[in-house]
Amino acid sequence: MEKSDLEKIAEVIKKHDIFVLSDEIYSELTYLEKHVTIASLPGMWERTIVINGFSKSHAMTGWRLGYACGPRVIIEQMLKIHQFAIMCAPSTSQYAGVEALKNGDEDVAQMREEYNGRRRYLLHRFKEMGLSCFEPFGAFYVFPCISEFGMTSEQFATELLNTEKLAVVPGTAFGCLLYTS
């Protein structure tokens, strides 16, 4: 999301005294502009809880290692729930996370560049095939418009699997309705 959009959202949040839970798991995988966290905007740190982790940025999917940053009073309450409801990440995962934070920046940059190359390739190929596609500015998902095929995204995914042996995830799994039927 662009900084100007975040600033507009922040104004509404401050006006109505709302807290923000900001999922920033893809913050290191943005391609056009550097990620801006809403917590960095004036008056937003004290009303923002940032959720992040290592699964996307450091290719540590399955390690179940993440973190939350925010006002101490909120984080302390989250910790109370977490301590008694959820087991902690294994110590090996925690050590790997520390290593990723200390020495993983170059790896993240290489992955981001690789993902961006794949993104550009897919967008180019979809355009060649005559399929419009929302251009993602981060992460590693693309959502081509399949409306011309007259199928739901589930039907389309099943058809691709059965006829082309290509497995894809239907757009509805991501809440994407515009590009699914």
List each model region and its residues:
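PLP-dependent class I/II
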Residues: 1-181
